Amino acid sequence: MQSTLRAELWDKLHFILGHSTDRMIRGELLYDGLIETGLLKKALLHVTETHPVLHSSFRDHFLYPYWEIRDYSIDDILTVTLTDDPGQVRDDFMNQVIPADCNVQYKAAVINHDGRSLLCVMLNHMCLDGRALHTFFYQIALCYSRVCEGLPLPVLETGSRAHSMIYSGLPFSDRIRARLLLRNITRLKEKRTFAYTREGPSDHLRIMRQKWEDVAYIKMREAAKRTGFTVNDMLLACYIQALSETCDFPAEKPLTITCMVDNRRHIKQSARIGLTNHVGLLQVRIDRYGSTIGDTVRRVHEVTTREKKKRFFGLQGI
C-alpha cells in the first residue's frame, strides 16, 4: 500500500511562500435547511479516501519534499455547532491555519442556526487550486445526494497529481519547447518589490469580506458582453484601480499584477487527474492605471488579449 506521495511543483512553492501567506483556501455555502450530519460524514470520508493528499502530512526533506499518507478520523475534519451567533463561530473557524504537517489538509464546519446550515470549508492551498476546489465541492455534493437517496457511493474521478501533466496534450515538439520556456525571467529595469513583509509577532489574520448580490454580477456580465471585455478583465481592473488609489501609487508609473492561469487547457483530454495545482503565472503589466475605471479596464483587456494569443499561454511562468 502506498505510504507517500511526491510533492509537486506548486505544493512546494506554496510551502515556500508560507512566510507571506497562510496558504489557506476558504469557502462557505449557506443552505436553506439543515444538513444531515451523518450523511455528510459519509460523503466527506469517501472524498477524503479518494484523494490521499487530503489525509497526508507534508515533509520538508531538503532534497525531496514529499507527502506522508496518514491515518485520520472524521473528528479530525468535521465539527458541528448549534449557535445563536453564526457569524462569530464562522470567523473563529475561518481564522485557523492548518499546519502543513497536520494529518489532514482540510477541515469543515457545519454551523446550525435558525433552521439553516452554514457549511464552512478550509483547505491547504498546497493540495489544490481553485478549479480543483470546484471538483472537491462537486464530489462532496454528489456523495451526499447519493447517500441521501439511498444509493451506493459513486466512484469518484481521480488520477495523477503530476505537474508534468500540463504538457500531455501538446505535440512532442511543442512539449520540448514549452519545457524550455524561460519567459518568467525578465530584464526589466524597474525596481521589483514583494508586497508583503515577513511574519512578525504582532501579526494576526484578518478576513475582509464584501458581499455581492446576484444583481451586481449580472450587471457586470452584461457590461462585459456589451463592451467585449471579460468579467475577469473587469474584476482585475477593479482590483488594480482600488489598490493604486488606496496606496497612492504614482499615476505615471507602470505596475504589474501577477495572476493565475488555469493550465488544464493543455492537458490531454483523456487524462485522469487528481486534486492538485495546475496553474501558471500571467504577468499583467500596464504602463499606468487609468484616470477612470473604464480606462483601466481597457488597458487590462489589451494585455490579456495579447497574452491569450501566445502559443504557450500560461506556460511561460510556472
Question: Model-derived features: where do they sit?
Answer:
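Acyl activation and transfer enzymes in specialized metabolism, enriched
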Residues: D32-P52, V121-Y138, R209-P250
